[in-house]
UniProtKB/Swiss-Prot annotation:
Residues 234 are vesicular. Component of several multiprotein Golgi SNARE complexes. InterPro entries: Golgi_SNAP_su1. GO terms for molecular function: SNAP receptor activity. It is found in: Golgi apparatus membrane. Involved in transport from the ER to the Golgi apparatus as well as in intra-Golgi transport. It belongs to a super-family of proteins called t-SNAREs or soluble NSF (N-ethylmaleimide-sensitive factor) attachment protein receptor. Cooperates with ykt-6 for proper expression of Golgi-resident proteins. Required along with ykt-6 for normal embryonic development, seam cell division or differentiation, and ray formation. This is Golgi SNAP receptor complex member 1. The chain crosses the membrane at residues 213-233. The gene is gos-28. It comes from the Eukaryota. One of its GO terms (biological process) is protein transport.
């Protein structure tokens, strides 16, 4: 199982490096923004195509990294009684990879929203520039300010939703971590009872004594109830 763990760990690091590269490419779309009003519509369309391609690739890599982390959790949880899996460094590694995944998710959503907002603004400005060249429809360009404000409002709502999703993912990770700890405790107890038969026998005796005490108590209560009923009737 240690070989499987090492293979998953290497795969996780490789996927994390790929996400790093893609995030840099995504942020470059914001850095290369013209920022002015003289924007060509074809250029904006090309940047939007690149944006969709990069975001799709990053989402696929994040999903892949999530699956790898789940596999690592399963391997460590199933072998928690083994010497290598009980090493605190293993739990630290699991926790570190989950934190990296969460940070990548937050960074991706932030960069995606920023780039999408910039591209939407550039698209509106490029459309406005094309229409403003025609005097007959020049007055239509005034409405784009309203569209830009509405777009900012929608992006703000998206950011709030992303924050809620991030909180839900954090809760899920905490629950999964607690489940792994509980499975580890259960496996260790099972291992101890097998390794030390005396402890297992003692636990069985305690369980048997509890059952006997319960039966005696039930008999005493039943006798008292029967005696009370006869006393009331008589």
């Amino acid at each position: 199982m240690s070989e499987t763990w090492e293979a998953l760990r290497k795969k996780a690091r490789s996927t994390e490096n790929s996400i790093d590269v893609k995030l840099v490419s995504l942020n470059k779309l914001t850095a290369s923004s013209h920022g002015g009003f003289d924007i060509d519509e074809k250029t904006v369309s090309s940047r939007q195509t690149t944006f969709r391609t990069v975001t799709t690739e990053i989402e696929g890599l994040i999903e892949q990294l999530t699956n790898i982390n789940d596999d690592m959790n399963d391997v460590a949880g199933a072998q928690s009684s083994a010497s290598w899996a009980s090493n605190p460094a293993i739990q630290h590694t699991l926790r570190r990879h989950r934190e990296i995944l969460r940070d990548y998710g937050s960074e991706y959503r932030r960069a995606r929203d920023n780039v999408d907002q910039v591209l939407q603004r550039e698209l509106l400005l490029s459309s406005s520039n094309n229409e403003s060249r025609n005097p007959a429809v020049n007055n239509r360009a005034r409405g784009y300010d309203m569209y830009l404000k509405e777009n900012d409002h929608i992006n703000a709502c998206d950011r709030l939703l992303d924050e809620q999703i991030e909180m839900a993912m954090s809760t899920k990770e905490n629950v999964a971590r607690q489940g792994i700890n509980l499975r580890g405790i259960s496996n260790r107890l099972h291992y101890i009872t097998k390794k030390y038969p005396a402890i297992n026998n003692l636990m069985q005796k305690i369980k048997t004594k509890k059952q006997k005490n319960t039966m005696i108590l039930a008999g005493v209560i039943s006798a008292c109830l029967i005696f009370t009923i006869f006393w009331i009737i008589n």
